[in-house]
Amino acid sequence: QPYKLDSQLIQHIDTLIRRKLSPEQVCAYLCKHHQITLHHSTIYRYLRQDKSNGSTLWQHLRICSKPYRKRYGSTWTRGKVPNRVGIENRPAIVDQKSRIGDWEADTIVGKGQKSALLTLVERVTRYTIICKLDSLKAEDTARAAVRALKAHKDRVHTITMDNGKEFYQHTKITKALKAETYFCRPYHSWEKGLNENTNGLIRQYFPKQTDFRNISDREIRRVQDELNHRPRKTLGYETPSVLFL
């Protein structure tokens, strides 16, 4: 027999789905924080019924979004990164994920390449920092990265990034944070797949062609907080914030 959802439980489910949690994450959250045992198939069934009634709650499911792919043209990434150290020289401990403090960095470019976000993701906890960039100039990216990570300086050992020109002043980051920077092999973006995946989650909130100049810092912080307070299956349904902070 299908589980009968009462109005209070439905309110909980609606709130969590609107926060972009998957049905599996909703079940884990309800079990952990409200001692409610529910199977994710029950939530999918509820969402299907809700959709047939004309509701749009189902649109908050991540399955509705196309996979994120970085698409701002290879011309921006051409050239040789000054003082580049390749990922093949990165310490083995980074891949072992046995410590907190190894980060991946990337950018999400807005409409017409006129605006962008810098995204920083810690590899073990999935803790995410999102910053609005004034431009894609290397000096702006370096300044934003230092400003974002300075408060966590004792937990910044390495930062892995791609070969985009926006990261050409990575030595400023290294000097300010006393951390090492490493670069993926050209066209091997999967070597920092965690950040690529996180950017896909961020694109749920800010679709392609978003002009980030029109997005407030408060809104960006709201998205950052939602991601960091979302229970993750890979973390045993714990949240990045709890594990990192």
Go through each PLM region and give its residues:
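DNA-recognition alpha helix
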Residues: 23-35
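Short conserved beta-strand segments at catalytic cores or DNA/RNA-binding microdomains
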Residues: 95, 108, 112-129
